[in-house]
Amino acid sequence: NEKGKYVKIHCADKNCMFSLKTGRTIPVYLVDEEIYAKCPTVIISTVDKFARLPWSERVGLLFGRTDRYCSRCGHIAIGEKHAGRHNADVAAGLERAETVACKPFYPPELIIQDELHLITGPLGTIYGGYETVVEEMCCIEKNGKKIRPKYIVSTATIRNAGEQIKFLYGRNEFAQFPPSGFDTRDSFFIKEVPLPTENLVDASEEKISRMISDGKKPFRQYAGICASGQSVKTTLIRLYSIILQTALDIAKEPEYEDYIDPYYTLIGYFNSIRELGGAVRLLDDDIASRIRVVKNKYNSLEQRYLSFEGKKEITSRIPSWDIAQVLEKLAISYDKNKEKQGCYDVVIATNMIAVGMDVDRLGLMSVVGQPKQNSEYIQATSRVGRQHPGIFTVYNPYRPRDLSNYENFVGFHSQMYRYVEGTTTTPFAARARDRVLHALVVSLLRLQVETMADNGGASNINDISDEQIKDIL
């Protein structure tokens, strides 16, 4: 409702208490203006929204800075211009609305930041600057003492956490959970499991599940491939063709048809759009031709054909709504009773899948080239193999770094978290201040000084005392 400035969200289930017939709406708000008006208890956002701080006085509503409430428009920010009443609008179905005074409320007391390892480099530098404004707005005074908000940050791949927390949040003390511990073979994030000595081909599902719960079955297995004298494209063609054709051959065998699902969809991981673009052409031509060669070489009963619908990519070139559909379809399993499968054959992607792709059925991935950061390699390969192992890393023999990782393959993969690089964040460096300091000052002026909150409040800059400016700086 454009005039009413709200969006009603109902459940499609007629028996739900939030269905359309009950008149109740799901208390979830998706539009920025509605979030400002409703001031919900929990706010989920991305860090790029920090850029709105100096541009709108309504952002202050997220920190409890309200002094009026309109029955139609919701909370009104301190210093925001707003009419005292609204006349009824019969055409829009809106009743007369009054604006009444209200008290400000407490700002957020708990901030949860996920994927801390991604806040690094230029993003982390700008983020650290804006974080000073967010923390200042979340502080409350009690008995002459300033109480700051509590932060909970999570990540699975981090090094020098104390230094990064100091640069981002200005905190010298922090508690890390879980602690490092006393046994290097079990660090909570990764556990060293000895390979089983018995043959598990004929093991029952109950036995395998029991081994998983007891921590006796490896979840993820890595295989390194480095073909000297061959190009990476040639290696990739042969690897993809043998994996795809072998998956179909095994799926046609009655004794394995119930276990082939994790390996029927191949995830291809690439370090750049350029490398991925070359793989798209290979899938359309060379890999399809090579599959025919593999089929004839091993006398397979049936050839694996890669349809257009069975090949997808997850990159920045694809619209966001298409990516959501691809991720949803990735959960479709192999069905032994269907001749035409609904699951994907191949999905190729860049580091977009390193965060947020959680599909338990996936068990097979090919990583072309060692990523620049080891944390990216760990995050990307953890998207698959959560229940069933299988990751192939194709190294480029003509790149010294790839060759070094291949030669130290076992040592590296047995202690990957040891090789995670430290993050770099410098929010208070000279060049960083040049970029962001003016925005921070404007944000604090608009959010803390009532006469400067409105867009026209800049003309009141002479009314600011020297003490106020010193406090802000």
Q: PLM features: residue spans?
A:
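Cys/His-rich short segments
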Residues: N1-V31, G64-C102
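SF2 helicase catalytic motif II
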Residues: P40, D48, L62-G84, C102-I140
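Conserved two-lobed SF2 helicase motor
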Residues: T41-F50, K338-A354
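Conserved helicase ATPase motor motifs in RecA-like P-loop NTPase domains
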Residues: E115-T125, V134-Q164, P179-S180
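Conserved interdomain linker/interface between the two RecA-like ATPase lobes of SF2 helicase motors
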Residues: P149, R159-F167, N172-D286
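Conserved helicase ATPase core of P-loop NTP-dependent helicases/translocases
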Residues: I318-A349
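Conserved segment of the helicase C-terminal RecA-like domain
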Residues: C343, Q379, R383-R418
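A short beta-strand element within the Helicase C-terminal
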Residues: I353-G369, I391-V394
